[in-house]
Amino acid sequence: MKVNCSLSRKLASIAQDLALRRALIVYVTMRLSLSLLAGIILWLHPIPRTPDERLRPYLGTVPITGGMAELLLGAWQRFDTMHYLKIATRGYSPEGGNSVFPPLYPLSIRILGKAIGNNYLIAALSISNLAYLGMLILLYELTRQELDEQTAWRSMWYISMFPTAFFLLAAYTEAPFLLFTIAALYCARKGKWNLSGIMALLASLTRLQGCVLFFPLAYEYLEQRDFWFRNLTWSGLSVFSAPVGLVSFIIFRYFNGYFPLRETYEVYWASTAVFPWESLLRASYTFLAGRSAPADVLDLLFVYFFVFLTVIAFRRLPRVYGIYMATTILFLLSRVNAIHPLSGMSRFVLSLFPAFILLAIAGQNSLTNRLIVYPSVMLLVYLTGQFVMWGWVG
């Protein structure tokens, strides 16, 4: 028995080392490639360096200009990054739209930024990049646990080559949210409910959609106990940590005198709460009427594609992952933008990590692998360029 336990520990250690090595390969490849691409784009097509409230909203942050600093750092001073930096340095604006952003990421930026000499952009990028690396390791471990190592290897590449994957390397919440979400589900599958609850809480303090982790975690907890109430223990309370994060944020906003979330979205983000099918129908109608911008078309296509993958997830993966995908999509579709109906969905679908596991399963076939990789890489290059040039992507 001791020999078997020792062997199991050694094999687990080797597997973890393999996960780290492979994650580093993917991370370094993507980091160098996209940084080089961003630098080349700005070198070939310099953009105006003066802030513009509509075209280049730096929100009071001084643009990084000139030399390698602009090519390596200034290229990532874009859109939501500026909101996070503003919150980190000046706090929430009582009459501004940035109060819809949960506090964990900007607070982390503030703490690390102060520790490294008030270099807040470097802090923001460091946090998101470390989270991206950690997310890759956990995605590999989770997929290997559920399937096999080759599928795990492909899943890391597929999510990293997705057309909007550059957001995982930017100063955005995509990577931290995915890290906490995958960790919550990974720990739940292993029955480590206290740790799973902590990760779910952190996820909901990073992104509002983290609250829906309650549903897959509750299902997984009940399934592990054969859906029999006599098998329930106090550890089951950990599944409530995800909505606790959202409720805490709502209470924080209330006592600080901010408008309710719904009003803030309506006034500052031109977004209204709707039933999920309403936003999808409105986006579809806009497309059929020929009024969709290119970004809108991409958002719509990705939504339909990931809805399809959600259906497949219920058939090919443990049910907890299908529930996670379904509830997340319903949450994301519960708002509609007056200008771009599904605004940001091409970015938001990155959080649907089980979809990339499904693609990795399909990618066992060499032709399917090429059909996934080639279009993804081409779109990734194009959309990264759009982002760097202050073009709206999501």
Tell what function each PLM region has:
Residues 110-111, 123-146, 307-312:
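Transmembrane-helix motifs of polytopic, lipid-linked glycan transferases
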Residues 33-51, 76, 202-203, 210, ...:
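Membrane-lumen/periplasm interface segments of specific transmembrane helices
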Residues 138-141, 158-161, 176-195, 355:
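Specific aromatic-rich, kink-prone transmembrane helix
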Residues 143-147, 151-164, 168-171, 185-189, ...:
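Transmembrane and membrane-interface helices of multi-pass
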